[in-house]
Amino acid sequence: MPATVVLGAQWGDEGKGKAIDQLSPRFGWTVRFQGGNNAGHTIVIGDTTLKLHQIPSGLPTPHCNLVLGDGMVIDPWVLEKELDSWWELTGERPEESRLFISERASVILPFHRMYDSTDKVVGTTGRGIGPAYRDRIERVGIRFADIEGILGNPGAMLEISKRMTSQLLSVGMSEEITVANLEGDLRWILDRFSKSIAPTGPM
């Protein structure tokens, strides 16, 4: 199947979202393949302006399916805010019909945001994107496909919560990530987005 790929030159703010918005009526799918919610594009519908950070800008095209792809690090809480804003404007719930989250995409958890907030040297956005990609590279990050299995494995839950707490202590933070914290977050993600999580590669 032929595809059109829109790539940025280097630093962002090049108008990729606008280009995709104009191209999407010609296509059945809009796929974002990497990145996190440090990105952003603005959608203006009538007198209403929406700021999107994760959902592809093909969103206003009704026939266009939307994919958050394998290479993304996704903050589920930010995603919910974007979806709620769209529902309030249009009455549509794309996550129930045409929004698909790759099961291989990585999850940004509150731990990642906390850890990121301590980095004053690089000057990050503090949204947990760097730490989430670090966990992905080190093969200790949680993908959407992993959530159900982790919830059914008390040993894994304990190991993950201890690792996160240890990493926070190493950068001078006293917050503890308990098993209960982790379980609550993962159960909410699974309950909220189970209809959208899918093996998006074959699509």
Residue spans for each PLM region:
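Non-transmembrane, aqueous-exposed alpha-helical and coiled segments at domain scale
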Residues: M1-M203
